């Protein structure tokens, strides 16, 4: 009883095309639900709600992921976030430091990961030697004791000079959209097989790829 009646009908029609499979009998939910046949997805529809985008094979999803990136959407592709949690933490860490707030040594390590030695960090300080995970630092204390060369007037994209230009452009688009990079993405992209057991309020299935 996981899907509405109209969705169940379409799912059964697709499943019946599979010649070698073990039949599974299940009933739909009591409500009707809706199914829309779309020839070209309206990318702006992904602004709200949770989404699951499916295709038959991994390589078929590459174009989908590229389109989502170009339009500044945060998504998960086959279990991997389009922006890693480490990078999301690094962005928040720099923002906190510029505000004058304290951050943990672990957070600083994530930040330093995206900074180049010599240009943003003095040699020998990349891994914060002689520190504990919960030690606290400010921008000033990092500059004085932990080799930080980046300065308060630098924006995140200047301070974290190890991030590629493509990723900087993408992150800027995400931030303009107000995406929360610390939360699990609303949009998930996967193969049909890979989404087994997954659920979403809105589902996009590339039927043209299934014969």
Positions of the model-derived regions?
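The feature marks helicase ATPase cores and/or their adjacent C-terminal helical subdomains
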Residues: 1-210
């Amino acid at each position: 009883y996981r899907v509405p009646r109209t969705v169940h009908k379409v799912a059964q029609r697709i499943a019946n095309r599979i010649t070698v499979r073990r039949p599974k009998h299940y009933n739909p939910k009591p409500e009707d639900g809706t199914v829309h046949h779309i020839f070209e997805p309206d990318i702006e529809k992904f602004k709200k709600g949770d989404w699951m985008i499916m295709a038959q094979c991994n390589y078929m999803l590459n174009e989908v992921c590229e389109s989502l990136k170009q339009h500044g959407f945060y998504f998960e592709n086959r279990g991997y976030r389009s922006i890693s949690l480490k990078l999301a933490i690094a962005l928040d860490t720099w923002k906190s430091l510029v505000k004058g707030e304290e951050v943990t040594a672990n957070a600083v390590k994530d930040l330093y990961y995206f900074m180049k030695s010599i240009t943003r960090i003095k040699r020998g300080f990349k891994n914060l030697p002689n520190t504990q995970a919960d030690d606290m630092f400010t921008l000033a204390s990092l500059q004085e004791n932990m080799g930080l060369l980046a300065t308060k007037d630098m924006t995140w994209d200047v301070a974290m000079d190890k991030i590629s230009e493509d990723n900087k452009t993408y992150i800027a688009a995400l931030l303009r959209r107000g995406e929360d990079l610390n939360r699990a993405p609303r949009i998930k992209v996967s193969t049909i097989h890979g989404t087994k057991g997954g659920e979403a309020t809105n589902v996009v299935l590339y039927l043209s790829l299934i014969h």
